[in-house]
Amino acid sequence: MPSVFIKTFGCQMNVRDSEQVLQDFIERGYQIASSEKWADIILINTCSVRAMAEEKAIDKLASLKTAKKKNPNLVLGIIGCMAQNRGREIAEKYRFVDLVLGTQKFHKVAEIADNLLKNPDRSSSYVDLSKEEAAHNAINKHLSTKAQPIAYVSIMQGCSMHCSFCIVPTTRGEERSRPIDEIFEEVKRLAETSVKEIVLLGQIVNRYGAKEFPWVKGKSPFVQLLEKLSTIEEIKRIRFTSPHPLGFKEDLIAALRDIPQLCEHVHLPVQSGSDKILKAMRRGYSRSKFLSLVDKLRKAIPQLALSTDIIVGYPGETEEDFQQTCSLLNEVRFDNAFIFRYSAREGTTAASLGDQLSEEVKFERNYRLLEIQNKITMEKAQKWVGQVVEILVEGESKKNASKFQGRTRTNHLVIIPKNERWRGEFLPVRIVETTGHTFYGTPLISGIDEALQFDLQEEINPAPIVS
């Protein structure tokens, strides 16, 4: 039986795309290799949002040249965002690559790679970066090899916002949304398995259907979708990522308040606290409008947890601009923040701007902002210690397989002792300790000692929120 291995870089949408590709291979009689060493086909699903992500993928590709020499019949492919953006360059420079497919070809990866494996006489790379009508509708399969309580559902592809720093409209194309009924049927199928929570995915997820579907009775297509999915009884939690502040109209705020399945967590990317930088980024809102939105959300959902994305070192960012971002963090007090150093992306407006900041300045500002946020994160996390929360137990902790992990409705990660009876179940847990980014808890169920403690030192320290 032939085998396939996929190394995935980047966001959750890339992970979801890889899942689709793997399931297509399974349906063709392949098995998923546990390591690239055992694979007949090796694919790298790539990311282009920052230079570091591309560098990691290129390094991985270069490291596989030896494997290709040892086994010329090995099929080696590059797929995803970097393939879309730099595919022909990659095929020309790395001639040992057999396959380069863009972001609108995920549904064809298995077929093409399988044909290449059956044809060892390959004279050149197979490259296809073309657009394909309705390709966004094809990301609808989930791995049949393992049951999970949480499933990610792609509801749209692409982005039409064209922020000045962002390469996504180039790599993913303009936004295209799947029909509500198709998404509903996909989630119904998931609900018939072990899935209890779904996470809806889109580059700008709350712009779902903006071009394709009408508002009905004052409700956007996205809210219509949320309401329909909430009727599936087995689905107890619904999340979505990643939204844009401009997409939070009154109907969505009301839905967050009124639909019980919608979790009390919103990821709200602000990117900067400076009006000058926000305008240069083409974000479409001011600092004051963002703060007003935060106020509306918190008034509607008092238990709401907020996370955000921030870019430091955008071209032309002065110390005063940076201080405005620092003050915004202190004013909003996000539960978590993902802080990134600006990375110039060729072809974007920001990459051609003057006054590009040095890497030294970017690193220094990144560090200072991270210090502020880490302090806020710890202060907010400490307030949860001693409280009882409900978690959905996902399975083994990513940092320590001898423990289980789960998440609260507010998206806080909780580590608990491992017990197979709890896998995939909702569990009441008392929070006994926190590192800020991670909570540690004691399950509160019949026959379990509430005072049960376990060695926190066994856990590997959680990764910092900056990447």
Curated annotation (Swiss-Prot):
Disulfide bonds: none annotated. [4Fe-4S] cluster 1 binds at C11, C47, C81. The keyword 4Fe-4S applies. Pfam families: Radical_SAM (PF04055), TRAM (PF01938), UPF0004 (PF00919). Residues 382-445 form the TRAM domain. Residues 2-118 form the MTTase N-terminal domain. It catalyses: N(6)-dimethylallyladenosine(37) in tRNA + (sulfur carrier)-SH + AH2 + 2 S-adenosyl-L-methionine = 2-methylsulfanyl-N(6)-dimethylallyladenosine(37) in tRNA + (sulfur carrier)-H + 5'-deoxyadenosine + L-methionine + A + S-adenosyl-L-homocysteine + 2 H(+). GO terms for cellular component: cytosol. Its cofactor is [4Fe-4S] cluster. PROSITE patterns: MTTASE_N, MTTASE_RADICAL, RADICAL_SAM, TRAM. Its EC number is 2.8.4.3. It is an enzyme of class 2 (transferase). Keywords: 4Fe-4S, Cytoplasm, Iron, Iron-sulfur, Metal-binding, S-adenosyl-L-methionine, Transferase, tRNA processing. InterPro entries: Elp3/MiaA/NifB-like_rSAM, Methylthiotransferase, Methylthiotransferase_CS, Methylthiotransferase_N, Methylthiotransferase_N_sf, MiaB_methiolase, rSAM, rSAM_horseshoe. Catalyzes the methylthiolation of N6-(dimethylallyl)adenosine (i(6)A), leading to the formation of 2-methylthio-N6-(dimethylallyl)adenosine (ms(2)i(6)A) at position 37 in tRNAs that read codons beginning with uridine. Monomer. Belongs to the methylthiotransferase family. MiaB subfamily. This is tRNA-2-methylthio-N(6)-dimethylallyladenosine synthase.
